[in-house]
């Protein structure tokens, strides 16, 4: 079973993720959390007269073998896999040609961005927004994102702004693109090298596209163009994957350098200003929509009645209150961001106890809230874990069989040896990780909730089943002085410092200039692919009815 509930935490402005591309042949994972979008408005420059020269044809010479898994060549003074160098060189020529044939949609510093490249980024932003809306519908029964799935971005106004969704998407494109290129350029200048696993991930994305194209009996370029638009080549698409991989690696390395630069006294000084900001609490939250029956709500006095009330009053028969109302461990700020400051204030009020229940007027609704675990300062914990990942296409019966098989192994240990040493043997023989140190957020929340419950004792064990997989956990103990707030504050300080650095470089060398005539053509071009995607959504919706 996969360990992480979410991907690596973002730094200040992490370069756009390279996963979840909506190209045929690439499986798109369900969005794990509702995406909150916050972007900066792009800065515009007076149009420059000088234009980039056609790229020179670079003959790629491989470097001498050094025993590495991959064959390398040089790209602008930096060692890269030869496949990457060839793709980047080809993409540079393709981009130049696309600018001449389809027009320059944007200029980012001294880079020209063609209409096809803009459409690629724009369509992906659109796609992620639709995933967010679909997730909202899945979790709450309603689309709370403000984005209409069946209207074009140019046809609908953003609910919190004075402009259309197309402008929102354009701002995101500019920010993502500028940051990707800026961090990539910095990475190349710094001589950053990717790990073998990162290189493999990029090459696998190309192989996925190739398999998808083969299944449709067309070329990779045709596959890419069908998803995005005419003029976008496979090399241009893959160049972005490479750019993002290096940008992300450099972002992570620079962030880590900042983190390592802070002393404990630096961190403690921040913590002492407001310790409550670094505590976490676990509660259930149910939005009371429609008619509010105060008498009915007042009869809810425990967790069982809370869940019964939520299941009874939710409009969807398939609603699972036990899963959906569970928040996991959240800080006051995070809770306030999701439900409103009133909910955060209630949860972290002095004297709050487990079992407390209230109706709180929050950001969007009245919320019925139930306190599971009052606020505390979490630490890392040592555990052993062995799990089974469920395939998303598994039937309920197959999942049941997988769980029963895993549970049988767990019970054989539990009812037999039952010791820590025995669990280690059981875990490692079943491809477990042995002993590991974990923090809140490292596992799916069902597992997280069990591990980090303050009542947990050394030697506790459990077999847990989740929507993603099942796993057996052995609790070794809590690391008393290894508080999460130490890590949180260091990462926050590093994020702020990295953000300042990024903004300084972006403002100096990557300011954006729009070509509005070409952008209008780009919107029309993107609409063709968006309409195709909307048709697929409609067909899927009909099938689910």
Place the predicted regions along the sequence by residue.
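N-terminal Lys/Arg-rich, disordered targeting/topogenic segments
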Residues: 1-23
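Solvent-exposed loop/turn and edge beta-strand elements of beta-rich ligand-binding domains
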Residues: 17-31, 112-131, 145, 193, ...
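PPIase-associated folding chaperone regions across multiple families
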Residues: 18-29, 44-101, 219-292, 330-404, ...
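Hydrophobic membrane-insertion alpha-helices, especially the h-region
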Residues: 29-41
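N-terminal targeting/tethering segments
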Residues: 64-231
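Sec-exported extracytoplasmic/periplasmic mature domains
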Residues: 123-131, 174-193, 204-218, 242-259, ...
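Surface-exposed intrinsically disordered loops and tails
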Residues: 139-162, 323-325, 333-348, 443, ...
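Peptidyl-prolyl cis-trans isomerase
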Residues: 296-342, 404-447
């Amino acid at each position: 079973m996969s360990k992480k509930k979410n991907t690596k935490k973002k730094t200040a402005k992490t370069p756009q993720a390279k996963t979840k591309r909506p190209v045929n042949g690439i499986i798109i994972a369900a969005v794990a959390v509702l995406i909150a979008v916050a972007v900066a408005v792009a800065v515009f420059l007076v149009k420059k007269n000088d234009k980039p020269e056609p790229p020179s044809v670079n003959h790629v010479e491989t470097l001498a073998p050094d025993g590495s898994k991959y064959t390398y060549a040089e790209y602008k003074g930096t060692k890269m896999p030869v496949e990457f160098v060839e793709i980047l060189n080809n993409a540079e020529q393709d981009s130049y040609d696309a600018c001449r044939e389809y027009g320059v949609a944007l200029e980012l510093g001294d880079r020209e961005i063609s209409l096809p490249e803009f459409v690629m980024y724009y369509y992906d932003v659109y796609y992620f927004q639709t995933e967010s809306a679909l997730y909202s519908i899945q979790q709450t029964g309603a689309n709370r994102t403000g984005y209409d799935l069946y209207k074009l971005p140019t046809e609908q106004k953003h609910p919190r702004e004075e402009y259309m969704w197309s402008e929102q998407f354009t701002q995101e494109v500019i920010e993502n693109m500028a940051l990707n290129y800026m961090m990539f350029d910095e990475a190349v200048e710094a001589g950053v090298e990717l790990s073998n696993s990162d290189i493999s991930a990029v090459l696998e994305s190309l192989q996925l596209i190739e398999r998808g194209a083969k299944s449709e009996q067309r070329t990779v370029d045709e596959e890419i163009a069908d998803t995005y638009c005419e003029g976008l080549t496979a090399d241009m698409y893959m160049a972005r994957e490479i750019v993002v991989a290096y940008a992300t690696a450099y972002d992570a390395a620079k962030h880590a350098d900042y983190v390592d630069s802070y002393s404990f006294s630096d961190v403690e000084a921040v913590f002492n200003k407001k310790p409550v900001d670094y505590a976490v609490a676990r509660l259930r939250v149910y939005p009371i929509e429609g008619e509010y029956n105060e008498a009915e709500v007042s009869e809810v006095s425990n967790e069982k009645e809370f869940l019964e009330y939520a299941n009874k009053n939710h409009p969807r028969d398939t609603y699972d209150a036990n899963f959906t109302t569970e928040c996991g461990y959240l800080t006051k700020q995070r809770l306030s961001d999701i439900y409103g400051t009133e909910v955060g204030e209630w949860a972290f009020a002095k004297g709050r106890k487990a079992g407390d229940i209230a109706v709180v007027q929050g950001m969007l609704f009245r919320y019925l809230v139930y306190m599971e675990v009052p606020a505390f300062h979490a630490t890392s914990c040592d555990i052993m874990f062995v799990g089974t990942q469920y395939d998303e296409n598994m039937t309920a019966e197959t999942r049941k069989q997988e769980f029963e098989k895993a549970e049988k192994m767990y019970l054989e240990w539990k009812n037999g040896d039952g010791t820590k040493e025995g669990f280690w043997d059981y875990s490692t023989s079943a491809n477990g990780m042995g002993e590991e140190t974990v923090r809140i957020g490292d596992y799916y929340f069902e597992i997280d909730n069990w591990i980090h419950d303050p009542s947990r004792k050394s030697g506790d064990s459990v077999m847990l089943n989740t929507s993603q997989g099942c796993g057996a956990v052995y609790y070794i103990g809590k690391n008393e002085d290894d508080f999460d707030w130490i890590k949180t504050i260091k990462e926050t300080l590093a994020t702020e410092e990295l953000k300042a650095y990024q903004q300084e470089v972006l403002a100096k060398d990557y300011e954006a200039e729009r070509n509005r005539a070409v952008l209008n053509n780009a919107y029309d071009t993107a609409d063709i692919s968006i309409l195709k995607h909307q048709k697929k959504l409609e067909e899927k919706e009909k099938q689910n009815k």
